[in-house]
Amino acid sequence: MLEHIRISFQSIFSHKLRSILTMLGVIIGIAAIIAIVSMLKGQSEQLKQSMIGMGNNAINVVYQPSGGEEESGGPQVSYASAPPVAEETVKAIKSDPMVKGLSLYYLSEGASVFHLTNVSYPQVYGVDDDYFDMFPIRITEGRKLTENDLNSTHQVVMINEAVRDELFPDGEALHKSIEMNGVPFKVVGVFKEKNQQESMFEGDYANPVLYVPKKVWPLIEGFDAPTQIAVQADSSEHIQEAGVMAADLLNQGLSEAELEKAEYSVMDLQEIAQEVESFNQSFALLLGGIASISLLVGGIGVMNIMLVSVTERTREIGIKKALGAKRRVILFQFLTEAVVLTSIGGILGVLAGFGIAKLLTVIFPMPFIVSIPAVVGALIFSMAVGIIFGLLPSIKASKLQPVDALRYE
């Protein structure tokens, strides 16, 4: 076995250019499969996280119509009409062992923010200390909102780099004044960090985002009911359970009349996971089919070059048979060479696939996840290509008659 592998490597490296060109189809096919699987797994995880709260084991509890009234033309429900959340309910949720954090915050996507003649239309968050405990940010200029800011009506704001670029083309934003819905705010910090509401297809803070203390929210929007309730579980296994528990406690604080109109609920994560998985399977089948064509072409190339190799080594085969080598020895030697050739192509394809996936994450900022089963499967598949397409040349070599082979010039 080891001798067959040694001879295979010797043959491959004695014809380097020919071997590389032969492996090219296999390399491209395997690289495409690895890149596709890595990107799909990364996008799948990011999509699921974006739908439940964008990571950190957090899930959003939403206030929405009961029994589908909104869709059927019933009364519309707005966050402005949501009843205040009792402090006892907040304490009850936080006291549950499954809950690591809880934040009642505000989110608006319709605000117009001005500085002189420049305008931005960011996502505006009204937050407290609990929010930053759950979703840390990284300050690049200035400072964060302090505890004193967050517990007061200080009209201060943190903006991300997208807002800074839109409102302050010269890049100088600190201590400048901006106006939001007619209310002035002073910029105290600029941040850059991945946002929990960010689109999976966009880069870090491709969307404009800013933070204000939640106590100033009534000045901006005219109401004082949280639009978002985020629950952070102690582990990923408890995300759904913690969210349902929080929704139940919040609903217990509503009257029967309020429950008839609207209620708190959470997304079904299992349903989300199934939908994402279904989409990924369909997409993977489509792209996998395209990659398989490359592997098929690569396999045909392997068969062709092995037939050429058999022809070139006809006298060598004749000598070995004349010295007593059996058919299965000759067959196994050429089959081993084909498998070694495609296995090297498979390994290079895996490395190239990870390289392509990593490059795509730079061009289109999104994660990729290394899939060990995909790597193992790709290597096994590349070996299978060698066996399937190397079998015919190997059989041809093993059937050569010693006398005819020795006569070959």
UniProtKB/Swiss-Prot annotation:
Keywords: Cell membrane, Membrane, Transmembrane, Transmembrane helix, Transport. The keyword Transmembrane applies. The keyword Hydrolase does not apply. GO terms for molecular function: transmembrane transporter activity. It is found in: Cell membrane. Pfam families: FtsX, MacB_PCD. One of its GO terms (cellular component) is plasma membrane. The chain crosses the membrane at residues 20-40, 283-303, 344-364, 372-392. Belongs to the ABC-4 integral membrane protein family. This is Uncharacterized ABC transporter permease YvrN. It comes from Bacillus subtilis (strain 168).
